[in-house]
A protein has these predicted regions:
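Phosphate-binding P-loop
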Residues: 2-10
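Conserved glycine(s) of the Walker
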Residues: 20
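Walker A/P-loop NTP-binding motif
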Residues: 23-34
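Conserved helicase/translocase motor-coupling segment
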Residues: 25, 152-167, 177-214
Length: 214
C-alpha cells in the first residue's frame, strides 16, 4: 500500500536472540530489490554490512551492492519518501544523532521514517549494549505519529538457535533477571555464570566446556 499510495507505514518486528531477525531482514531486501523497489538495509554496526556486501556481490558491481547496505547515520539529509523501503536491523542500537561527533541531524529513528514510504524496524530492547543505544519501540511509535505514519507490530517467537529450545532461553531470562518467566522445569543442572571483558577469553572458556561435554 505504501508503494502505491505514498502513505507512510512503519512495521515494528520484535524478536529475541536467535529468532531470525537478520535472516528475515536480508531476505526482505533481496525480495524487495528484485521487485525494483528502492530499498536499503541499515545497521549501526558496520561489521554485518561488510560481510553481507562481500557474500552477495557475485557478478554485481561493488558500488551497486554497497548502495544496498548503509549505516544508520546516512539519512539526516534525505528527502521525504526518498526510498520505497528502509529495513533497520538491530534497531535498538540506533543513536539519537549522527556524525562522528554525534552533532548532525535530529534523531536517527525519525530520519529513517521520514526518508521511507515504508520503514521496517527489527528490534530487541534487551540487546542494547552501550549508553548511546537509543532505539526503542516507544521512540518508533512517537516519531511515526509525528510523521503521520501508520504503525504495525509483530513478534517473532520461533527459536532457531539452541536446538529450537524456547524454554531454555526463557530459563536464561529468569536466571539473569531479565524477566520472570516461571520456567523452572527441565533445567535442573549445575551451571557457571561469569563476566569476561575479552571475547577471546570467552571463546577459550567455551572450548574447555566443549572438551568436557564432547
Amino acid at each position: 500500500d505504501s508503494y502505491r499510495s505514498n502513505k507512510k507505514n512503519v512495521l515494528i518486528v520484535e524478536g529475541g536472540p536467535g529468532t531470525g531477525k537478520s535472516v528475515l531482514a536480508i531476505n526482505l531486501l533481496v525480495k524487495l530489490t528484485s521487485e525494483e523497489m528502492v530499498s536499503q538495509y541499515i545497521t549501526k554496526n558496520s561489521a554485518p554490512r561488510s560481510i553481507y556486501c562481500e557474500k552477495l556481490q557475485g557478478n554485481h558491481k561493488k558500488s551497486y551492492i554497497n548502495n544496498l547496505f548503509k549505516g544508520s547515520g546516512c539519512y539526516y539529509e534525505s528527502d521525504k519518501n526518498e526510498f520505497d523501503v528502509l529495513i533497520v536491523d538491530e534497531a535498538h542500537r540506533l543513536n539519537e544523532k549522527s556524525g562522528m561527533f554525534k552533532n548532525k541531524g535530529e534523531n536517527q529513528t525519525k530520519e529513517i521514517i521520514n526518508a521511507a514510504k515504508f520503514s521496517i524496524f527489527f528490534i530487541d530492547e534487551n540487546q542494547r549494549v552501550t549508553v548511546s543505544d537509543a532505539g526503542s519501540k516507544e521512540a518508533i511509535r512517537f516519531f511515526a505519529g509525528q510523521l503521520n505514519a501508520d504503525v504495525y507490530e509483530m513478534k517473532l517467537d520461533s527459536q532457531f538457535r539452541c536446538n529450537g529450545a524456547d524454554g531454555y532461553l526463557s530459563w536464561l531470562d529468569d536466571v539473569l533477571e531479565i524477566k520472570q518467566t516461571a520456567n523452572f522445569d527441565g533445567f535442573e543442572f549445575d551451571y557457571d555464570i561469569k563476566v569476561v571483558d575479552d571475547p577471546n577469553v570467552m571463546r577459550d572458556l567455551i572450548e574447555k566446556k566443549n572438551v568436557i561435554n564432547n
